[in-house]
Curated annotation (Swiss-Prot):
The modification Phosphothreonine is found at T237. Component of the Mediator complex, a coactivator involved in the regulated transcription of nearly all RNA polymerase II-dependent genes. Mediator functions as a bridge to convey information from gene-specific regulatory proteins to the basal RNA polymerase II transcription machinery. The Mediator complex, having a compact conformation in its free form, is recruited to promoters by direct interactions with regulatory proteins and serves for the assembly of a functional preinitiation complex with RNA polymerase II and the general transcription factors. This is Mediator of RNA polymerase II transcription subunit 4. It comes from the Eukaryota. Belongs to the Mediator complex subunit 4 family. Residues 225-238, 248-265 have a biased composition (Basic and acidic residues). The keyword Phosphoprotein applies. PANTHER family: MEDIATOR OF RNA POLYMERASE II TRANSCRIPTION SUBUNIT 4.
Length: 284
């Protein structure tokens, strides 16, 4: 082998080592990714283009270029150029795949929630009594009701009616006039109807109507002083001898007014005595 041949072999081996670190070589290192990418036509054309190019470079390094390899490289390049146009379609497929994955995750979460709710409903349903038990309890209640005779109910009702005699063990002091539902006579006299009858004019007065007031004749102060002087001269008592009323006289006057008011109220109570005797002891 000549010196040129040895140099060409060394150069070709160096080129092979440099090409081993290419993108395709790194992708082939992973078996899983290789299985997925091998199904793509673009990946196959790219691998074929790289292999053909490496063969052509090797033949050129040996100073023996092969035309068949060059033609094959041209055909591979044309096919690769045609398949590059499919990258947009692959991009759309990838986006649709991401959307489908997102929808799948949402459906999984919804399904998980539905299963949890169904599990809770199952536990609640399991805690409820069975239909047979409910029907059994219903039948027992109906049987107990059917055992009660109507004559017994009527006999018990006659014991409670007011036409029967009071049992000997009955406490007469338990029920009195204070326990009846209707009001007593005193409460009726002090009720709203009795108070309304006293103030009928105020209650029946039309709103906005002025209250009629008795007119009091007004006397000028000069005339009132002259009249007082004349009365003093007739009585023969000087003005200096007039009595000075203090608080004691006022208290006596207030007590007299209070006694008069009480007498009026008693007279009004006597006038309102309508003989409303609603309690009849003979009925019991």
């Amino acid at each position: 082998m000549s010196v040129q041949d040895t140099k060409a072999v060394e150069f070709s081996m160096g080129h092979i080592r440099s090409s081993s670190v290419s993108l395709v070589a790194e992708a082939t290192s992973n078996t899983n990714s290789e299985d997925k990418l091998s199904k793509v036509q673009l990946y196959e054309d790219l691998c074929r283009y790289e292999d053909t190019l490496s063969k052509l470079v090797e033949s050129v390094d040996r100073f023996k270029p092969n035309l068949d390899i060059a033609k094959d490289l041209i055909r591979t390049d044309e096919a690769l150029f045609e398949n590059v146009k499919l990258l947009a379609e692959y991009d759309n497929i990838y986006r649709n795949l991401q959307k489908i994955d997102k929808d799948s995750e949402e459906l999984d979460s919804k399904t998980r929630k539905i299963l949890e709710i169904l599990n809770e409903c199952h536990d609640e349903l399991k805690a409820l009594p069975m239909l047979e038990q409910v029907e059994f309890e219903k039948n027992t209640i109906l049987q107990q009701r059917s055992k009660i005779n109507s004559t017994e109910l009527l006999d018990y009702a006659t014991k409670l009616s007011k036409f029967t005699k009071i049992p000997p063990t009955f406490d007469k002091g338990a029920v009195g006039p204070n326990n009846f539902i209707w009001p007593a006579e005193d409460a009726l006299r002090r009720g709203m109807l009795a108070m309304a009858s006293l103030h009928s004019k105020e209650l029946t007065r039309i709103p906005g109507e002025e209250v009629e007031e008795t007119e009091v004749p007004t006397v000028p102060p000069s005339q009132s002083e002259e009249q007082k002087g004349q009365m003093a001269k007739k009585e023969g008592t000087p003005k200096t001898d007039s009595f000075i009323f203090d608080g004691t006289a006022k208290e006596v006057g207030d007590e007299a007014d209070n006694t008069k008011d009480k007498e009026k109220e008693e007279n009004n109570d006597d006038a309102l005595d309508l003989d409303l005797d609603l309690f009849d002891p003979d009925d019991f």
